[in-house]
Amino acid sequence: MYKLFFIAKNNLKKHKGEVAILFALMFLAAMLLFCSITLILSGDKAVSACKDKYHAADLIVDVPQMDKEELRKIIESVDATEKCEIVPVAQIAADYYYGDMDSEDAVSFSYYVFDSSLPTYLNAFPEEFENLKDDEIVLPYYLSYTNGIGEDYHIIIGGKDYAFKVKGYAENLYFATTMNISGFYALVSHDVFEEICGKVDPVSVQLFASCKTKEGTDIDDYDVAVQRALPSDITPFTVTIDTMDVATTAITTIASSLIIVFTLLLIVMSVIIMHFSIKNFIELNIQNIGLLQATGYTAKSLRLACITEQMIIGVIATAAGILGGILCTDPLRYLSGMLSGLSGFDGISVPALVSTIVGIPLMVLVGSFIATRSYKKLTVLESLRSGITSHNFKKNHFPLETNRMPLSLALACKNNFGALKKSIFVILIIALLTMSTCIGFALFQNWALDNKTLLRLVGYEFSDIEAGTVGDEDFIEAVSKDPAVRKVNTLTTFQSVEVSYQDKTTSLGIDVYRNVNALENNYFLEGHLPEKENEIVLTNMESDILGVTLGDIVNVKSMTGTGTVPYIVSGIDQKMNNTGKKAMMSEAGIKRINSDYQYMSALIFLNDPSKAKEVKKQLEKDYPNIQFMLGEDVIGSSIETVVKAMEGICVIFVIATCFVVILTQLLLTRAQVIRERTDLGVSKALGYTSGELIRRTLMTNMPTITIGIILGILLHIAFSNQLFLTVFSFFGIKQIIFQTDLIWLVITAALILVCALVTAFLSSRGITKLEPVRILKEE
């Protein structure tokens, strides 16, 4: 065994450059794998920690203002109820600004404002946040990355500017991110809460019930039971803890999954490069291998020595990668908190540790086992003759005497076809890198620069201005006549509506629009919009849950009466909103189950969206009792975390791609210069300049890199949407089209080519130091 380690140790010393390159690749792969698995598992741990620490309710029930004790009796009458706590909440649309911003820069968003003098056991907040002062406010945890404790924070409600100091940040699983209940969770003093309630529409002040169920209770069944127990004229908004679990970890899961996919590609590339490195080592040291064989070493023992060498690199690189991941605990904690809105990141993840410790060395073992099979084919005589056989029967595709290409290009093509396997490996590496970089740019384009694709996936109809007014037809008529307005639609969302088909039942949210044909952000899959009063559109997720197809009849529970009302499934769409648990109706359709229906929000679309802020100010003057929000602000606040995550992924992909291209080119060019040292010396003796020889070396790798880039772009075009579809499938997303503009493909190609050319040029500078006479004497 010592002999194997002795050979492996000396081999490592002999080609330190290649060892360093392989180590760097494996280190990067190990660190990314450890960090991404840690991040993806941290979400569930943070959720569990939040549940235990703050006693998360199994169900929340938000109802319009009614008698508090009556609501308590109704909920407690449901057998599975173990505990119920009820507090008032003000659901408002407001403008806010902080830090260096002023009132002119205020951003619109919705708030769920709670009274800090009413602490609860379920969905609790820390004791230090009880009975706040009038100038103090507590905000959701994910805002801690944009606002510091003690900083100024202003909310404009009903024309009054409330100036606060940030007291701290609370973790509430139901408001953990904008993917949960859309709106900022806020705690204020009792007096400020009462003042706010007096300023807003009474409809906005509701009761917020937190319910704990008995052990073993099915939460969905309990949700249905609570809704059925409520009076028929009450339309509740209910959310289960299971839905919040998915929503809280959604962005973390998406971001981490994409990084894991890239990491797996990186591992595959590392194995390919290792395979080439082993082949190259055998080629360059074939005489030494022959001497060892002649002295009694078998092919098996030499093969084991090579595998041992690669395993040493792999194990040390894995350990270093894990250490690097552990040192990244603070950045990971920051990223986890920003994506999940919770602070429960606990650092080292044992599953991530085990997966990395086992995964990377195992891939190295398998890759080196396959690559070292060449040892079995070597004979002593062939090895001592430097592997040169008497004849080469391969076709000469580029005869120099008849070829019209430039000499450097012709020689480059001869080299590539002469070492076809190596060329294929390089093409595969560059293709995978190109594909992953294009994916990063596609995410950046579709989610960060232009969010139309994201908005369609979310499935929320964002307008230029959103007005929170209930059933005011005069307002709709007046605004529609405004010359600055392009169109007006209405939106009302009913949550937790019971829909059944045969023996299957589900609870979902229903979006109701006045003009369904005017929708701009709906992602329709099949069928048609619910134009008639007896039609309903279900998301792909809900249609799968119920097992329905187009034309089937589902029963929707009446909101103002008893029994159910039948609807025909006229279409299937898809959306991430409410984790895919959605349906859509027209106003005529909703009135069949809610005869008291009145719209809740007016969606105002402008001819010139750039003037939205001016139009909003004028509307606030004309209608002081109506709350207005800028659609752009709502979009920004809702998807800000997603955009930052996609920007981060793009940066990771680009940096890692440049890093791998540089390392690959270092390995290839260095090996080429060493392998062709004699040929280069002869060429110099024949009169070729160092510049010409460097140019020839550069040209050798350019054809394979160019082909790899083209192949990678084609792979991106062919398979990237399928990859995205797999990542988003847990939202019920069935169809997705991410556009990648030509400019990003050109940037990717240029990035890889520039990195490859510059690296190859710098690493081939050693040609200038070659001395023909000395080289020929050595030979």
Where do the PLM segments sit?
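Hydrophobic alpha-helical transmembrane segments of multi-pass inner-membrane transport and secretion
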Residues: H15-G43, A250-G290, T308-G325, V354-L362, ...
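Membrane-interface junction motifs in transport/secretion proteins
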Residues: M26-I74, L443-F475, M600, I604
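Peri-transmembrane interface segments
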Residues: G17, L39, G43-C50, D218-V268, ...
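The feature marks short, hydrophobic/small-residue-biased sequence motifs that occur predominantly
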Residues: S36-I37, E85-N131, A163-N172, L187, ...
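Short cytosolic juxtamembrane segments of multi-pass membrane proteins
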Residues: Y2, L378-K394, R765-E779
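Short helix-loop junctions at transmembrane helix boundaries
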Residues: I322-S355, R695, T706-R774
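Hydrophobic secondary-structure segments that place a key small or acidic residue at a functional site
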Residues: F125-F193, H528-E587
